[in-house]
Design a protein with these regions (language model features):
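ABC-family nucleotide-binding domains
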Residues: 60
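Short loop immediately C-terminal to the Walker-B catalytic DE motif
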Residues: 56-57
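Catalytic Walker B motif of ABC-type/P-loop ATPase nucleotide-binding domains
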Residues: 50-53
Length: 109
């Protein structure tokens, strides 16, 4: 791993409140910590498109807002992010377009 990659990883771990666990085995992390780590890994991947299924389920309000802010930032920087969620607060916090899936056809809002 390059120094630049290590710096990016450190930054993401710090941003998501996980730096103190950098040497911990994932099984030692709580569910919310694992969830934040998975999102940090997805962001770190550098992929142009991220597909996130219920990315904030089980997270407290503070961490949900942290994730929402980072997703907005990633989108502003040109990343396409598809979020599948039932969380209205997350939708209102970071989504530009919404498609509701139900029994009737929906339109993009």
């Amino acid at each position: 791993m390059t120094e630049e990659s290590k710096d990016r990883a450190r930054h993401l771990l710090k941003e998501f409140g996980l730096y103190e666990y950098r040497d911990a085995h994932p099984s030692a992390l709580s569910g919310g910590q694992k969830q934040r780590l998975a999102i940090a890994c997805a962001i770190f991947s550098g992929r142009g498109i991220l597909i996130l299924d219920e990315p904030t389920s089980g997270l407290d309000g503070r961490n949900m807002r942290l994730i929402a802010e980072r997703l907005k930032s990633e989108a502003r920087n040109g990343r396409t992010i598809l979020v599948i969620t039932h969380d209205r607060e997350l939708i209102e916090s970071c989504c530009d377009n919404v498609v509701e899936v139900g029994t009737k056809p929906s339109e993009v809002q």
